[in-house]
Amino acid sequence: MSIFFKPPIDIEILFDNEESRKHVDIATRSSNSSYKSMKESLPVYEDGESLGGIVTLRVRDSKKVDHLGIKVSVIGSIDMLKSHGSGNSSSKKVTSSTSSSSSNGSVDVRKNSVDQFLCQSYDLCPAGELQHSQSFPFLFRDLSKRYESYKGKNVDVAYYVKVTVMRKSTDISKIKRFWVYLYNSVTTAPNTLSANETKATTNDIAGGNYAADNASDNTQTKSTQGEAADVNQVLPISHSNNEPKPVRLDIGIENCLHIEFEYAKSQYSLKEVIVGRIYFLLTRLRIKHMELSLITRESSGLQTSNVMTDSTAIRYEIMDGSSVKGETIPIRLFLSGYDLTPNMSCNYFNVKNYLSLVIIDEDGRRYFKQSEITLYRTR
């Protein structure tokens, strides 16, 4: 209906120095049925950084518009798919006025807000009359931002500025989104593997036997490594004496294959390189090729209705053909060239990252094992 009944006021929101700021391109879902791929460029802000700009109101057709006041708000919310039972949450919810005629840009209508963790607002203009275009500056000083922005398949962490023109009939509103990065101040430790290190000084992880696929079933053998701590806004990264211990996975199929998969540490910044190696102790399995993947796992919803979604952020082939006993394959995985998500966690969702080693034999059977790593953002 908005095609036939346009609001009498156009609202434009501009952030200070927006053009000179760093931007990120975020995939958005088209509001129509064509599902065309779209991207939106959003300015990036940090925790504690002030947010200011100018709101311009333009009256259509030079008509006078009465209003009950003009308000500007900055909002941060966690949004989840409507089918995930978010209505059971007792947390503070975002309430959407049914009388609001808003231009919401790329807001995903499939998702409901389950937690509004940030909401600050103040009046730009008292009740009165608009006869011509007017501009109003706004500023939110030292704005605290609890979570990093995130756009997943089932959950979003969204930040936006909302301007509302309050009226007796239908309110007119407009939002403008921005993106938030949270940086960890940890100093990264050396990312190397010493050839003289022994198992007694490493973080050993006892890997179980691989399970082969039958016809179409994949059986995953899970690592017994302790899970890395979940994080909220800043990851609690700690390095003892600045010397992280390497992680070693012993992987094997009885009387067929025995591999040592080792990498330098379990915590990486998004700009680092994962350095490791694969050492073959026993090779009676006819291997076709081997892949290394970095998998991002999103878990959303309440515990009774938890939904897990995996997406492969990185995949590349590290070996083609069979190997021989004693062969070593070096690994260098550069993280900076990919759009990765740091580990995140809150009451409604968490995001974890895993290294996955996949072996495919000549019969097409797949053997794989995963080990959790912690990713965090640094400047």
Swiss-Prot record:
The modification Phosphoserine is found at S216. It holds the Pfam family Vps26. GO terms for molecular function: protein transporter activity. Keywords: Phosphoprotein, Protein transport, Transport. One of its GO terms (biological process) is retrograde transport, endosome to Golgi. Residues 84-108 are annotated as: Disordered. Component of the retromer complex which consists of VPS29, VPS26, VPS35, VPS5 and VPS17. Component of a retromer subcomplex consisting of VPS29, VPS26 and VPS35. This is Carboxypeptidase Y-deficient protein 8.
